[in-house]
A protein has these predicted regions:
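Hydrophobic/aromatic-rich transmembrane helices and adjacent perimembrane loops
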Residues: 179, 224, 319, 341, ...
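Transmembrane alpha-helix segments characteristic
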Residues: 154-157, 207, 212, 251-257, ...
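Transmembrane signal-anchor helices characteristic of membrane glycosylation enzymes that use polyprenol
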Residues: 19-79, 255-270, 411
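Transmembrane-lumen/periplasm boundary regions of multi-pass, lipid-linked membrane glycan transferases
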Residues: 73, 214-217, 224-234, 238-240, ...
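Membrane-interface helix-loop-helix junctions at transmembrane boundaries of multi-pass membrane enzymes
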Residues: 17-18, 140, 144-147, 151, ...
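Specific aromatic-rich, kink-prone transmembrane helix
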Residues: 110, 138-141, 158-162, 166, ...
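Transmembrane-helix signature of polytopic, membrane-embedded enzymes
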Residues: 122, 139-162
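Signature aromatic-anchored transmembrane alpha helix within multi-pass, membrane-resident enzymes
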Residues: 24-27, 210, 254, 385-417
């Protein structure tokens, strides 16, 4: 089934030169919007701060009862003068972390090495800008391969470029813009190689190997997405009996993966035994009905994510558009007897299967895990409606679609706030000179490092006593959202909180009692983690220091504010209630 008819092509033709200019304008507008949100970004997701630490530093902070200075925190996040372009350190950090391959961190380290001792959100952002520019160009090229029409390709790429999905991916200081680039590059090369019937050349195959190599070394989800694209290539080449092409394709993909494993041999152990996915969790003792209903809840959560990123945060609008796309797809296939062209299947099958699989298997319900699929999903929705609008006989009415895309983008940016911008906190204006953080083995302090840099010194301690209300709060949240917990939400929460971890539970609360500096202070700002026993912590501080009073500076968010419990971690600035003791 073509997404256009021949008459439409003639009416809506646009030259390659004009298309290139328009695409450049779209990319500039998209990146300008992202940059505006970056200016307002105040606060970080904990993994964004880990980006800088894992890319730049071997610095260890005092997190078990010791004091840290702003210089300590800066050294934890930035490149020191004597560690510039030290890629061995980057490599070693990833071995220790055992979560991701090293290529993205090497990119961050390279940029930061030009600015030693500097911690700035703009350094990692610059990588995302370059990666997203390439991703949007590739999305346009893929759309043109599928549609054969410059204007339709611009609409497909433009809809994503001007969406919250694109902006969120660009401003999130992790590897997902880079992952999106390599996924789209692999898809584009696969379609290009598919078009060549037993005429695949070595140059293209080598490029495929390079893409596979760096995609694998960027994020392990590349292997899943790439595998799905490769499966489509396999099926069609077998049906067309182009076995030589298939063999070349498979061999050079394997070469790319093999080279990645030679460069970073920990890939296999990270993928099979790391801390990503439900398979890495210890779910023994949790009822099957709890797991099943939780997976359903996860799917609903990702529908919510898709609705926010692409459909103005309106689930009904997503459902309506999906219903129309599927309904008219059935109409065109079985009533009009029109088949999809095979190049479209390179986009449809991998993106949808990937999205659904990640929805069920991802360790947390986060938009970041499906970011790589959103460019293609956006394009597919646009193409579906281009096909639907082709039924309209009046050509002028077909302008409704591009106008709707622009209007929806404007409404979206005016009414829906992207993830990862934060900016609702007063914690960057310290009320005291010194700070005390009380958390757990979950290392919640990592979320707050940029805030700690505002104090003269910060003491970090661990409390082995968990929150007395956390499990009940999570149980209520889960039950209200359809999860049948059977009282086992504690085990499920524990499985996630200790996921793939080698964290050691310790208790350094006694340092509050014995530390002479803390005892000498007249006042101190105290961060108390959501995960720890808040009431017990407050009592301990009052009983073992000279402080007699306390007041709330900023309250933590409530779980009730979010449908997706992971949104709490995405939206909140600190995971803490913050007090002033005096």
């Amino acid at each position: 089934m073509q997404i256009y008819d021949e008459k439409s092509i003639e009416i809506m033709k646009i030259s390659n030169k004009k298309a290139g200019i328009i695409l450049a304008i779209i990319i500039v507008i998209s990146l300008a919007i992202s940059t505006i949100f970056m200016f307002s970004k105040q606060g970080y997701h904990e993994d964004e701060l880990l980006t800088y630490n894992l890319a730049n530093s071997s610095k260890q902070l005092n997190v078990d009862g010791g004091w840290n200075s702003p210089k300590d925190f800066n050294e934890y996040l930035s490149v020191s003068e004597n560690q510039r372009f030290d890629y061995a350190q980057v490599y070693n950090n990833q071995i220790i972390d055992a979560s991701h391959p090293p290529f993205y961190y090497a990119l961050v380290h390279t940029v930061c090495s030009f600015f030693p001792t500097v911690f700035s959100k703009w350094l990692a952002y610059s990588i995302n800008v370059i990666a997203m520019t390439g991703a949007l160009i590739l999305l346009y090229k893929i759309a043109k391969k599928i549609s054969g029409n410059n204007l339709y390709a611009l609409m497909g790429a433009g809809a994503y470029a001007l969406s919250l999905a694109c902006i969120t991916t660009t401003i999130y200081l992790r590897m997902y813009s880079t992952l999106s680039f390599f996924v789209l590059a692999f898809m584009y090369m696969s379609i290009k190689l598919y078009e060549k019937k037993n005429t695949v050349n070595i140059k293209d195959c080598l490029l495929l190997s390079v893409i596979t190599l760096f995609g694998t070394l960027t994020q392990y989800y590349f292997l899943m997405f790439g595998g799905l694209i490769g499966f489509v290539f396999l099926v069609f080449k077998i049906k067309e009996k182009c076995i030589k092409d298939l063999v070349k394709y498979a061999v050079f993909c394997f070469i790319g993966i093999a080279l990645a494993m030679c460069i970073y041999p920990y890939i296999l152990s990270n993928v099979l035994g790391g801390n990503r996915g439900l398979g890495s969790l210890d779910l023994s003792g949790i009822d099957a009905i709890t797991i099943f209903t939780y997976v359903i809840y996860k799917l609903c959560t990702y529908i919510q994510v898709l609705s926010k990123d692409l459909f103005l945060n309106q689930i009904w609008l997503f459902v309506l558009c999906a219903f129309c796309a599927i309904g008219f797809g059935i109409y065109f296939r079985f009533i009009k007897k029109q088949k999809l062209n095979r190049k479209a299947m390179f986009a449809i099958v991998p993106s949808l299967v990937y999205f659904i699989a990640i929805s069920m298997l991802s360790p947390f319900n986060s938009d970041r895990y499906v970011m790589a699929s959103l460019p293609i999903i956006t394009m597919l929705f646009v193409f579906a409606f281009i096909k639907i609008f082709s039924l309209i006989k009046k050509e002028n009415l077909r302008l409704i679609l591009p106008i709707s895309i622009v209007l929806a983008s404007a409404i979206g940016f005016a009414t829906v706030k992207p993830y990862y911008t934060y900016g609702k906190t007063n914690l960057y204006e310290p009320k005291t000179d010194n700070c005390l953080f009380v958390g757990t083995a979950m290392l919640e302090w990592n979320k707050c490092i940029d805030k700690f840099m505002q104090y003269d010194s910060t003491m970090i301690v661990q409390n082995s006593e968990m929150s007395k209300t956390l499990i009940d709060d999570l149980d209520t949240l889960a039950t209200d959202r359809g999860v049948i917990t059977n009282g086992k939400i504690g085990e499920l929460a524990s499985a996630f909180m200790n996921n793939g971890s080698e964290k050691e539970m310790s208790n350094s609360m006694s340092a509050i009692k014995t530390d002479t500096k803390l005892q000498s202070l007249d006042e101190v700002t105290v961060y108390i983690s959501r995960l720890t026993d808040e009431e017990g912590t407050i009592d301990y501080i009052l009983e073992n220091t000279s402080f007699e009073n306390y007041e709330l500076i900023q309250a933590d968010y409530s779980f009730d504010d979010f449908y997706n419990w992971y949104d709490y971690f995405v939206e909140t600035e600190s995971y803490c209630n913050v007090y002033r003791f005096y």
